[in-house]
Structures are given as C-alpha cells and as structure tokens.
C-alpha cells in the first residue's frame, strides 16, 4: 500500500459530487495546514476545448481538468499514472478524488492489472467483428487482446486498495437525480454551443478529433444541431436521455465498488450533499482518515 491517504467522492453525474469533493478538500486543507488537492477522475473532463459540455467549472482548482486537447487519445493507464502522481505528490500526503468514471476510479485506487494499449487498426477490426455480440464492447475488448496476442487481464475488482482509502458515494433517489439531470442538460444545451462551435472549427480545418469526444454526451447532439440536423430542444432532450442512461450505469458500477470495498475501506453512502449524516462525515473526515 502506498503512503498516502485518499478520500474518493463518487456518484452519478449531477449528484453534486464535485461540490462535495471541493468542500472536503477545502476542509482537509484547513485541518492539515497544507493544500490538499482535488483530483478529478473523469474520462471527459481532461479535454480542454469542451469545458461547458463537461461541466469543468468548480469552486477551487483541481488536477486533471482540461489538460489535453481533443485531438489527443486519453487512456485509463495515462489517467492512473497522472492521478497517482498528483496523489503521491501532495505535500499533505492526502488527496480527494472527484470520480465519475468507474473504470478510472478502480484503476486509481485499486492495484489491478490494466490491459495493454492496442493499435487503432486492431481496435477497429475487433469492433466490427463484435458488432453483433450480446455485449459488443466487452466482446470487442476480448478480440482486441486476442488479435494483439496479449493475455486477458485479471479482474478489475479483486485488487487491494492502493492507498489508505475512504469512499463517499452519493447515491440520489431516481426522481431527484432525473430532475438534476434535466437542469444540467438544459444548461449544457445553452452554454455548450461555444464548445461545439470550437470543435466544428477544428473539424473543418481538418483536425482529427478523438472519436470518443465526438461521440460523447453533449458533443454529438450539439454538433448535430449546428449541422442543422436537429433543433436545440431536440438536442437538449437527447442529452437528457443519454445522461439518465449514463447515470444508471454509473450507479451500478459504484454499487459494486462499494460492495467490493466493504471491510477494506471506510464507506459513507448518502442520498444527497445536504444529508445530515454526510455533513457530519465531511467535518470529521480528517479524524477518520488519520493525521
């Protein structure tokens, strides 16, 4: 186990986890007397040209936000390397994670094997071959490794915690979460157009934008709107629907992570940032994770 203390704040999009993470890092900074960083663990917030679509605004500076251009491919392995460097480089010996991407969180806080990076050509071939599978993404990844001649990685759930770890899991009720997602989708549709125009300019100039960015929630819909294919209200509704589906997947992942970490990490599961039990936990977290 590495010599650092980590509090991971996770939850579905629009659950309020970023606000909780920033509040906690500020509280720990005050208690420690030295800066405790917030490290963002999100596969899309790393891209600097789409700050509105990916909700990068926050109350205090954070690591791994807007750090690479949309023309760059970003991987789980790169995120783990950069996140762990930020954690272990903290003068406080502690960090708060703001985590929305489950695989990136597992890779950061658990000692698990990561599959090797596969060339783009092999990845495309595997994706075509797996198109008719029951789970195309999983089958494509299996085929990638087979075609590349690499062994399948071990379980991404069985690794031991890499740090002294506490997990705060924001798990809202579905109705309240869906309302928050609708508000966020409206905001993205209004404020994200500048991001979409920036991407449109790059594409028209011949730039090769990362396909993961082009297919992401908000980007796909707003680019479609700029091309005249759908109205802005239609874009907003599609963003909302896709975000609700994403939130369900995130919750299934974090449910499993919480079960996996039971007995191996300190767990706080809360329905909202205003939950009295969570408020108490935030203000006692310095004592919980140790000085």
From Swiss-Prot:
The record marks 101 as: Interaction with substrate tRNA. Substrate binds at residues 13-18. Its EC number is 2.5.1.75. ATP binds at residues 11-18. GO terms for molecular function: ATP binding; tRNA dimethylallyltransferase activity. One of its GO terms (biological process) is tRNA modification. Keywords: ATP-binding, Magnesium, Nucleotide-binding, Transferase, tRNA processing. It comes from the Bacteria. Its cofactor is Mg(2+). Pfam families: IPPT. Residues 42-45 are annotated as: Interaction with substrate tRNA. It catalyses: adenosine(37) in tRNA + dimethylallyl diphosphate = N(6)-dimethylallyladenosine(37) in tRNA + diphosphate. It is an enzyme of class 2 (transferase). Monomer. Catalyzes the transfer of a dimethylallyl group onto the adenine at position 37 in tRNAs that read codons beginning with uridine, leading to the formation of N6-(dimethylallyl)adenosine (i(6)A). HAMAP family: IPP_trans. Belongs to the IPP transferase family. This is tRNA dimethylallyltransferase. It comes from Rubrobacter xylanophilus (strain DSM 9941 / JCM 11954 / NBRC 16129 / PRD-1). The gene is miaA.
